[in-house]
Amino acid sequence: EQHIRREKAMSNICSNEALCALRALIYLCLLGPEGLRDVARQCYAKTEFLKSLLPDSWVDRQETTFNEFVARLPLPAEEAVSRLREKGFLAGLPLGALGAGDANELLIAVTEKRSRLELECFAEALREVACR
């Protein structure tokens, strides 16, 4: 509806949003209910695995998680993200930059797409960056 005036348009959804919704629908249909449960289990297990690789002082082990958690680093999270980017990692979201947490807090998300080896490499790189 790019060529239609805003007042006359019948919907406000753009092509990109519709394509994203269609892609999500296809993915969920292909997974099915059991597949979706399996993806959820993988996300949870891999998140807990990554947490187990980080020092206790960085992670609240009692915190309820699903596929993301907050790491409290010994350096500003933005600095850690920048250093990790140089190593080829997309590290997470510095919460302090959003005004949603302390400057040293990094929100890390884990999905079914990452292997245990990738998570081990990420944890090693994060420890190296933070302890430098």
Task: Name each region found by the language model.
Residues 1-55, 59-62:
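Active-site C-terminal subdomain of aminotransferase-like
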Residues 34-51, 57-122:
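Conserved C-terminal alpha-helix-loop-beta "cap" of PLP-dependent enzymes
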Residues 17, 25, 105-107, 126:
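Generic signature of intrinsically disordered, low-complexity, basic-rich segments
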Residues 127-132:
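Generic C-terminal helix-cap and adjacent flexible tail
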